[in-house]
Amino acid sequence: MPVRQLPETIVNRIAAGEVVERPASVVKELVENAIDAGASRIDIFSDGGGRRKIVIADDGSGMTQADLALAVDRHATSKLDDEDLLQIRTLGFRGEALPSIGAVARLSITTRHAAEPHAWALRVEGGDKTPIAPAALTQGTRVEVADLFFATPARLKFLKTDRTEAEAIREVVRRLAMARPDVAFTLAGEERAPVTWAAALPGAPGQLIRLGDILGADFRANAIEVRAEREGVVVEGFAAAPSLTKANALGQYLFVNGRPVRDKLILGAVRAAYSDYLPRDRHPVVALFVTLDAREVDANVHPAKTEVRFRNSGLVRALIVHALKDGLAREGRRTAANSASSVISTFRPASMPPANWDWRSSPSYPVGGSAAPSFAERAQAAFDVGAPSADIRPQEVTPDLLDRPLGAARTQIHETYIVSQTRDGLIVIDQHAAHERIVYERLKASLEANGVQRQILLIPDIVEMDEATVERLVARAEELAQFGLVIESFGPGAVAVRETPSLLGKTDASGLLRDLAEHMAEWDEALPLERRLMHVAATMACHGSVRAGRVLKPEEMNALLREMEATPNSGQCNHGRPTYVELTLADIEKLFGRR
């Protein structure tokens, strides 16, 4: 077959396959056009998941008759000058959206420019244009797309259900609405109740209101403002406290110069910043906005413009990590404070016995000569001095302790949790999780300073393991030594532990080594040295912290609270779990129906 030039209609349909993948792609392109036109309000309607109908109406600048005629031609755009490809400041710039949509659907455009006496309308069906005609419209542009992919029926087979396509449209609009809180959005359709996001005030407060409207009240309550700037690059936005996570990375919203993107570099930076706070199977919720010179970022990488490429990717990554870490450290003790409020509603008053209940029939009531102990006897046994339980006698509380962030320790329950009293309520602290974070931060600080101090064992601990595990540990001996753990091979199936970190005190060397070996088996060889060292520190901290089941004296409990107050990131342990939960007096009153 000889080489020949394809007809314009076929060329447009091929191009449409790159730009218009599904109904959500149409919505994205048209809403971006509305934003570029300076709209302050955008209304979106869809039917049949966008297959049957999509309508986008805005109050933007609109188009003149001449501009409308050109708008449906390929590569005709008002957003790009001859030599301006490296300084793109608009969401759209290729001039492909409208002709691509018109090539595969029935496209109707009605628009009015302020300089025109009335509106103009144009129709494109499968690439065939009708003449422009006068129409009625007050301001802006109204675009209707009907029978999507009628000209390319094969594409219809690859679409999902109406519900799935409608949800994809919703997600696209959510991301664009987050990027532009100054624009009001309304999303309606046959598949959903109308949703309206009112235009918010400029600045961070307005941005948080919009994010809270879209991501929910939990995000707003747990949001931490972050910001960093260097060499003309600005990173700002909001990150959720580590107590609010998801099972996947779908809760991470990233924007570059106002453009929603999915960028592996930024996602990796977010993961790195939260590495000290979250377990591996949990993901943070963030909304980050990166602003930089348009010449420093290439938005022309992907046909759908969902990917970007940075000229100085190292700077962008470092700035994101710095902004997030700084914000999380600054709000370290607040990160767990909201945990209690989210579960208050799950509490129910204890069930009361029925009115006709006979207390004498209770199994605990002594019948005849039963030797069942009385309540007083059982209570006395519970407080027996010789019993392995904490001393829970009320402790004297001074006013100054009540004013401390974590209050004054009052008691220990189940040899695991410390209950402290504050001026506004009470706090329950997980003693192991709290001390684990303290030890972890100490190890990191020692490593960054003069190295971790060691204690020499008079008699080395010999730990027997299989040969593969021994080889794995010995291969990392130099890294372990940086944390004060000095080991060496002791034959084919054993390791000798000669020194341990002083911070850990008397520790179970065998258990520590076995845990380290298990974690090392999961490491990717490409994992940076810094991340490997932090994994080692986390494992050591877990072994060197106060265990659940250990009885603490009142002075020990208070000392732990004071250390928590002085320790960065003390709201979570190294595995991402909260170290404490706060119940305010208002929360307690809700439990008892006083509020």
UniProtKB/Swiss-Prot annotation:
Superkingdom of source: Bacteria
Keywords recorded for this protein, A-Z: DNA damage, DNA repair
MF annotations from Gene Ontology: ATP binding; ATP hydrolysis activity; ATP-dependent DNA damage sensor activity; mismatched DNA binding
Residue ranges the record marks as coiled coil: none
Biological process annotations from GO: mismatch repair
CDD domains to which the protein is assigned, alphabetical: HATPase_MutL-MLH-PMS-like, MutL_Trans
Family the entry assigns: Belongs to the DNA mismatch repair MutL/HexB family.
Function: This protein is involved in the repair of mismatches in DNA. It is required for dam-dependent methyl-directed DNA mismatch repair. May act as a 'molecular matchmaker', a protein that promotes the formation of a stable complex between two or more DNA-binding proteins in an ATP-dependent manner without itself being part of a final effector complex.
Protein's name according to its UniProt entry: DNA mismatch repair protein MutL
Source organism per UniProt: Rhodopseudomonas palustris (strain ATCC BAA-98 / CGA009)
Gene field: mutL
